[in-house]
Amino acid sequence: MSSPDRSIDIDLEKYPSTATKSVYGQSKDDKNVFDIHPTESEVIPGEVEYADTPSHQNFLQKFFSDFKPVKADREDGVALKRHLKGRHMQMIAIGGAIGTGLFVGSGSSLADGGPASVIIDYTLIGIMMFFTVYALGELAVSYPVAGGFYNYAVRFIDPAWGFAVGWNYFMNYFVTFPLELTTCAITFRYWTDINSCAWITIFLVFVICINLFGVRGYGEVEFILSTLKVVATTGFIILAIIINCGGVPTDPRGYIGGKIIKNKPFRHSFKGFCSVFTTAGFSFSGTEVVGLAAAEAEDPQKSLPRATKQVFWRIAIFYVVSLILIGLLVSPDDPRLMGNSSDGSTSPFVLAIKEANIRGLPSVFNAVIIISTVSVANSCTFTASRTLHAMAAKGDAPRFFAYTDRLGRPLLAMAVCLLFGFFAYINAAGDVSDTVFDWLLAISGISNFFSWGSINLCHIVFRLAMKKQGRSLDQLGFVSPMGIWGSAIGLAFNILCLMAEFYVSLFPIGSKPNANDFFQGYLAAPIVIAFFIGYKIYDRSHIPSLSKLDLDTGLRTYPPKDKESEKIRDAKGFFKWIWQSLC
């Protein structure tokens, strides 16, 4: 066997298993890969293991055999498979979170805050996410463990806080799944009045089928759907520029320029400005999934830094540029916007095309919205099931949810998430469904800010502990070029967003302070606090000191020649540093 190119900090005396060519981030045929594969009783916590599957079976035998538990049932329950390739990670990063928050939710933001508020707030949230994803990228490359930032919060902040944000993160995507299925059905009203339950059934079955193929199915579907979303959004940007410049013969408005945005840049004064933060946060929901997917990536050390850098371009192009153009083309007073109408089949993107009197294209983009919604629904089941699986493996959720079958599927965690999708059928209950979905949406409303703030705080504590213990950043596979200050800025932004939403929830637009509006806007906060205090009372956990913080378990180190971060650190000149950081 050739000498290893990577150094893995595992004590061979403690883990005397044989060294084999194996799976950490590469195919088994890669002679440059060296892996220490421990025995079943000597499992290294946080590592992802390949499950053995029987050979010489026919299709039906293999199908049913795949549902059996993995051969090695580990304490942390991590038996997921590394099947996400680099191209999957790239598209999850670029287009994974582009969905109803951008295409539909931006309509209510435009109606509530006006185009200037939308552009400013989405840009601020984009900057915050830029810092957050880089911090997550550094942590995920160093610790590519199942559960992502939930495990980081348990380790670096406090077990009680990890428990609270873990359940908060799970419930966010758990309740969003039926909401996305309902949005799919409602969007079809643009063409037909067929009962929404029919469309819910079709898309629910589709998502269930995707999950039967495990993480490989998720990766392939997300790759295809994200590609379609990216192409469609790029096409819209080009078309919107042509419309604004008066290049569409069917548009009687001619050259538009900045007429619309100058007329009413802001709506509802400061309250309107603050109200957009929640919708913007929902629009960026899922950006952090690329870190969660690290546990199932073939080579997180190579694919994660590249995927992390793509987030900047997604924010800059697909969010900021497209919303600037929406502000130039769609009036915030348009009664068809989501904020002013119960008709969920329209979005500002569709309205911008319809106002130019272009036939056919509004239907095409409405189809893109449906594709985006299916993509988000697919991501919801992936994210919720993996988070529940990780919590169960650590004892923060019922243990049976840690069950993993031979294909690496967290079967029971996945099943409970998919079963909750049937809750979408309550849409047939009329007005009752609106009330139910309002409260479900309230659970996920501001939960993202707790998750993203925790990621930044984990990175800050991680860096401080590294410094306190005299560790060098040279051993890390990827180093965030924004450093600890980038995470501090990201954390501050999250706190400001929580404060802004508290203000709007307490003093809602167009009405007096009332308990109903407050809890529909801020319900996630008391839920997180209740989980945190409850765990503290039960377990009496404590915040670990920086000098005693465990930095070794699950840590992956790499020689300098194999590190993506070396390119950034060695870059000469400011502009080259910028290029290496973003490309």
Curated annotation (Swiss-Prot):
One Gene Ontology cellular component: Golgi membrane
Matching InterPro entries: AA-permease/SLC12A_dom, Amino_acid_permease_CS, APC_YAT
Residue numbers bearing the Phosphoserine modification: 22
TM helices/strands, residue ranges: 91-111, 116-136, 159-179, 194-214, 223-243, 311-331, 364-384, 410-430, 435-455, 476-496, 518-538
Keyword Transmembrane: yes
Domain of life of the organism encoding this protein: Eukaryota
Keyword annotations: Amino-acid transport, Glycoprotein, Golgi apparatus, Membrane, Phosphoprotein, Transmembrane, Transmembrane helix, Transport
Glycan attachment residues as annotated in the record: 340
Membrane-topology annotation of the record: Multi-pass membrane protein
GO biological process, one term: nitrogen utilization
Compartments reported by the entry: Golgi apparatus membrane; Membrane
Keyword Transferase attached: no
GO terms assigned for molecular function: amino acid transmembrane transporter activity; L-proline transmembrane transporter activity
Family, per entry: Belongs to the amino acid-polyamine-organocation (APC) superfamily.
Name assigned to this protein: Uncharacterized amino-acid permease P7G5.06
